[in-house]
A protein has these predicted regions:
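Cationic, low-complexity basic patches in intrinsically disordered or flexible, solvent-exposed regions
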Residues: 10, 18, 36-40
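Short hydrophobic alpha-helical segments enriched in small aliphatic residues
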Residues: 8, 25, 51-54
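Active-site and adjacent substrate-binding regions of carbohydrate-active enzymes
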Residues: 66, 72-574
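Serine residues within intrinsically disordered or low-complexity segments
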Residues: 18-21, 28, 64
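Intrinsic-disorder-associated, low-complexity terminal segments enriched in Asp/Asn/His/Tyr and depleted
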Residues: 4-7, 26, 65-66
Length: 574
């Protein structure tokens, strides 16, 4: 942040009514995703099933018939002709540290993304979304941000970022970046200043500090546990406690502080001025908090979607959070076209429309596909709820099968499809035990994944594609525990509830011949190669190990096979 930290109110948000709250289209929409007519939805899915040769096609054929019966209407109202370019787009999520390493450091970087821009253009996507690339201690994969207006020097520079933006825009590809407004890194200058300033200071007002309970304040203010395990409060040297919904290294901002509002309005403007087209808002449901009540111990602060439907939870999905996004909308509308935003908000389907309305963020991820098994009724419900939520908000539907937080869908579809009543319980149990508890039927998982992308592209709205799913990658379940990076694993234990999310974050395979060398043919992981992720003369190994079976999924192998998953994606996205 390079602004006036002491400004009494948001620097970019003071009564500025420039522009319109209605987004408009500045790019023609490709024929494959025109108005969502009933016939198009049905026949698109039918062709998908035929092409994928899925013997369980009756699951989605049934969904298709129900969509026809429901009589899907175009989401158009009077806003139709001015909908955002994102209303009908395919967006490719890049996890930068695992996409392409241009320097040999073992970490993917910004220049690596630029190097592969032709690959992205050929894939046929309209936009790329970059997970955090900011300076960070990397406690949580970059979601612990130490500086919101710079590039982590291990990943490049602002000049590299500008080059990447220019390369993307030259190919007609938009760029979306991650914004992390719920918390910062504990290495952020603001938090260091808060620790130094002491209780009651303006510096501490930027974060959520509270006195403890008990005779000497030795007990935390509430009994909450954090999302990644352990308590949600950490005590500092002078005896106060600070809140962190995730790790102790990620202290939560206090959004009742005007300086926090000013910071993020200026951050949004900083990146928009550099040419960024939009923003993905991390933990969008968590910013507004009410800790001045007596029933706090009755709640949990985990980011699930089973909170109260009336916005009464003390820290998650409160109605006041939308005041923040209405403020941001004024910043977005200063640009022509207005900056785009999408909420990562794990909230009930009945609350999604609040985030997706045109005067709010404008779009919200629908994670129902990412949560459902390959079961007809579950998939049908996911589609119904997604369409209804979009219709209610005046926005467009979104479809997400995989991302950096969930087990890859090719693996989920390859495991037994047994409803457990809990989110991903079976895949997470399978992962926790290094992929040994259930048989992964990869042939079936691949067939289902092929059908799934065709179904997704037949539906109205935006599709989000996670890097590697276009290769048909499966989850890497057996990463050695001592090489895991995800705090949701290392803050628990091998007998706890999760092994973490690293299995979907393994660096991509680009060249099959550059395979790691195995000390023993039975070894799963080797050394000395990176499947083209890093340069041939790289001095460092990839930051996560790549399994030997990656050679069959390398980009060069799949590019040469007309029937590969990659070429299927290229056809359906073209």
């Amino acid at each position: 942040f390079r602004g006036n930290l002491g400004h009494p109110e948001p620097a970019r948000c003071r009564g500025r009514e420039s522009g319109s709250s209605v987004l408009f289209t500045n790019r023609s929409i490709r024929p494959r995703r025109l108005e969502p007519e009933r016939e198009r939805a049905f026949w698109g899915v039918a062709v998908a099933l035929f092409a994928a040769n899925v013997r369980f096609g009756r699951i989605i054929v049934g969904i298709s018939h129900n969509l026809v019966a429901r009589e899907i209407r175009p989401m158009a109202t009077e806003k139709s002709s001015s909908r955002s370019w994102m209303s009908d787009a395919a967006i490719y999520q890049i996890y930068p540290r695992s996409f392409k390493d241009s320097t040999g450091s073992g970490l993917g970087d910004i220049a690596g993304i630029t190097q592969q821009m032709d690959y992205l253009e050929r894939l046929g996507i309209e936009a790329i979304w970059l997970s955090p690339f900011y300076p960070s201690p990397l406690v949580d994969g970059g979601y612990d941000v130490a500086d919101y207006c710079d590039v982590d020097p291990r990943l490049g520079s602002l000049d590299d970022f500008d080059d990447m933006i220019a390369a993307a825009h030259a190919r007609g590809i938009k760029v979306i970046v991650d914004i992390v407004p719920n918390h910062s890194s504990n290495q952020h200058p603001w938090f260091k200043a808060a620790l130094a300033a002491g209780s009651g200071s303006p510096e501490r007002a930027r974060y959520i500090f509270r006195d403890g309970r008990g005779e000497h304040g030795e007990l935390p203010p509430t009994n909450w546990n954090a999302n990644f395990g352990g308590p949600a409060w950490t005590r500092v040297a002078d005896g106060q406690w600070y809140l962190h919904m995730f790790t102790p290294e990620q202290p939560d901002f206090d959004w009742s502080c005007p300086e926090v509002h000013a910071l993020f309005c200026d951050v949004l403007a900083f990146w928009s001025d550099r040419g960024v087209d939009g923003f993905r808002i991390d933990v969008a449901q968590g910013l507004a908090k009410d800790l001045d009540r007596d029933d706090l111990d009755d709640y949990v602060v985990w980011c699930t979607n089973d909170q109260p439907e009336d916005g009464s939870h003390p820290v998650i999905d409160r109605d006041e959070v939308h005041d923040i996004y209405h403020e941001w909308r004024k910043v977005f509308n200063e640009y022509d076209p207005p900056a785009f935003a999408v909420a990562e908000a794990w909230v009930r389907p009945s609350r999604q429309h609040l985030y997706a309305s045109p005067d709010d963020l404008g779009q919200i991820f629908n994670f129902e596909f990412a949560k459902k098994d390959w079961i007809r009724d579950d998939m049908h419900l996911a589609i119904e709820e997604g369409l209804e939520s979009a219709e209610r908000s005046g926005s467009t539907a979104t479809w997400v099968m995989s991302n950096h937080d969930v087990v890859r869908h090719a693996t989920r579809y390859a495991l037994p499809q047994v409803p457990t009543g809990e989110y991903h319980r079976l895949p997470l149990d399978w992962l926790l035990r290094d992929g040994t508890t259930y048989r992964e039927d990869r042939a079936l998982g691949t067939k289902r994944a092929r059908a799934a992308i065709m179904m997704e592209m037949a539906l109205p709205g935006s599709a989000y594609v996670y890097q590697g799913e276009e290769l048909g990658l499966f989850e890497v379940a057996d990463i050695p525990w001592d090489e895991l990076e995800d705090p949701s694993a290392w803050r628990t234990s091998r007998s706890a509830s999760t092994k973490g999310r690293d299995g979907c974050r393994v660096p991509l395979p680009w060249v099959a011949a550059d395979a790691p060398q195995l000390d023993d043919p039975n070894d799963e992981f080797g050394h000395g190669g990176s499947f083209g992720f890093s340069p041939a003369d790289a001095k460092a190994e990839p930051h996560l190990p790549q399994p030997k079976w990656y050679k069959d999924f390398a980009v060069d192998v799949e590019s040469a096979d007309p029937d590969s998953m990659l070429n299927l994606y290229r056809r359906v996205l073209a």
